[in-house]
């Protein structure tokens, strides 16, 4: 670039005007910003959100303490303790998920042989302290009880792909 060309580019501010023209072109286009939480975007049917533990229709919890979900979790976010009952079946005494470690990969849900642990469509949850994101067995069962109809519908819709 010659000195004269450089002088004209800097004197007439052509680079600045090109930038302003580009900005002007995008000023009046449709905006893609979503004003969350007032506006919501559609959620995929396979979205993986908050975990829940399910129960059978008779009220008994589904988890058989096989510990497959604990073994397959890449983030080591699941902790399970179990005991043998009088009828020689295992049941969990402790089932904890640390959501600060969880990467929501869905391996726990895929590995469960009795569909006990599921990931729901719930994405609006928070914790003000680190301990608020540590879900115990009772908390997970409460989520499962509250949203059982939604969970069952999502499982039925996803059945052809399993």
From Swiss-Prot:
<comment type="subunit">
    <text>NDH-1 is composed of 14 different subunits. Subunits NuoA, H, J, K, L, M, N constitute the membrane sector of the complex.</text>
</comment>
<protein>
    <recommendedName>
        <fullName>NADH-quinone oxidoreductase subunit I</fullName>
        <ecNumber>7.1.1.-</ecNumber>
    </recommendedName>
</protein>
<keyword id="KW-0677">Repeat</keyword>
<keyword id="KW-0004">4Fe-4S</keyword>
<dbReference type="GO" id="GO:0051539">
    <property type="term" value="F:4 iron, 4 sulfur cluster binding"/>
</dbReference>
<dbReference type="GO" id="GO:0005506">
    <property type="term" value="F:iron ion binding"/>
</dbReference>
<keyword id="KW-0408">Iron</keyword>
<dbReference type="GO" id="GO:0050136">
    <property type="term" value="F:NADH:ubiquinone reductase (non-electrogenic) activity"/>
</dbReference>
<keyword id="KW-0472">Membrane</keyword>
<feature type="binding site">
    <location>
        <position position="73"/>
    </location>
    <ligand>
        <name>[4Fe-4S] cluster 2</name>
    </ligand>
</feature>
<keyword id="KW-1278">Translocase</keyword>
<keyword id="KW-0997">Cell inner membrane</keyword>
<keyword id="KW-0411">Iron-sulfur</keyword>
<keyword id="KW-0520">NAD</keyword>
<feature type="binding site">
    <location>
        <position position="69"/>
    </location>
    <ligand>
        <name>[4Fe-4S] cluster 1</name>
    </ligand>
</feature>
<dbReference type="InterPro" id="IPR017896">
    <property type="entry name" value="4Fe4S_Fe-S-bd"/>
</dbReference>
<feature type="binding site">
    <location>
        <position position="105"/>
    </location>
    <ligand>
        <name>[4Fe-4S] cluster 2</name>
    </ligand>
</feature>
<keyword id="KW-0830">Ubiquinone</keyword>
<dbReference type="Pfam" id="PF12838">
    <property type="entry name" value="Fer4_7"/>
</dbReference>
<comment type="similarity">
    <text>Belongs to the complex I 23 kDa subunit family.</text>
</comment>
<feature type="binding site">
    <location>
        <position position="63"/>
    </location>
    <ligand>
        <name>[4Fe-4S] cluster 1</name>
    </ligand>
</feature>
<feature type="binding site">
    <location>
        <position position="108"/>
    </location>
    <ligand>
        <name>[4Fe-4S] cluster 2</name>
    </ligand>
</feature>
<dbReference type="GO" id="GO:0009060">
    <property type="term" value="P:aerobic respiration"/>
</dbReference>
<dbReference type="InterPro" id="IPR017900">
    <property type="entry name" value="4Fe4S_Fe_S_CS"/>
</dbReference>
<dbReference type="GO" id="GO:0005886">
    <property type="term" value="C:plasma membrane"/>
</dbReference>
<feature type="binding site">
    <location>
        <position position="102"/>
    </location>
    <ligand>
        <name>[4Fe-4S] cluster 2</name>
    </ligand>
</feature>
<feature type="domain" description="4Fe-4S ferredoxin-type 2">
    <location>
        <begin position="93"/>
        <end position="122"/>
    </location>
</feature>
<keyword id="KW-1003">Cell membrane</keyword>
<keyword id="KW-0874">Quinone</keyword>
<feature type="domain" description="4Fe-4S ferredoxin-type 1">
    <location>
        <begin position="54"/>
        <end position="83"/>
    </location>
</feature>
<dbReference type="InterPro" id="IPR010226">
    <property type="entry name" value="NADH_quinone_OxRdtase_chainI"/>
</dbReference>
<dbReference type="GO" id="GO:0048038">
    <property type="term" value="F:quinone binding"/>
</dbReference>
<feature type="binding site">
    <location>
        <position position="66"/>
    </location>
    <ligand>
        <name>[4Fe-4S] cluster 1</name>
    </ligand>
</feature>
<comment type="function">
    <text>NDH-1 shuttles electrons from NADH, via FMN and iron-sulfur (Fe-S) centers, to quinones in the respiratory chain. The immediate electron acceptor for the enzyme in this species is believed to be ubiquinone. Couples the redox reaction to proton translocation (for every two electrons transferred, four hydrogen ions are translocated across the cytoplasmic membrane), and thus conserves the redox energy in a proton gradient.</text>
</comment>
<feature type="binding site">
    <location>
        <position position="112"/>
    </location>
    <ligand>
        <name>[4Fe-4S] cluster 1</name>
    </ligand>
</feature>
<keyword id="KW-0479">Metal-binding</keyword>
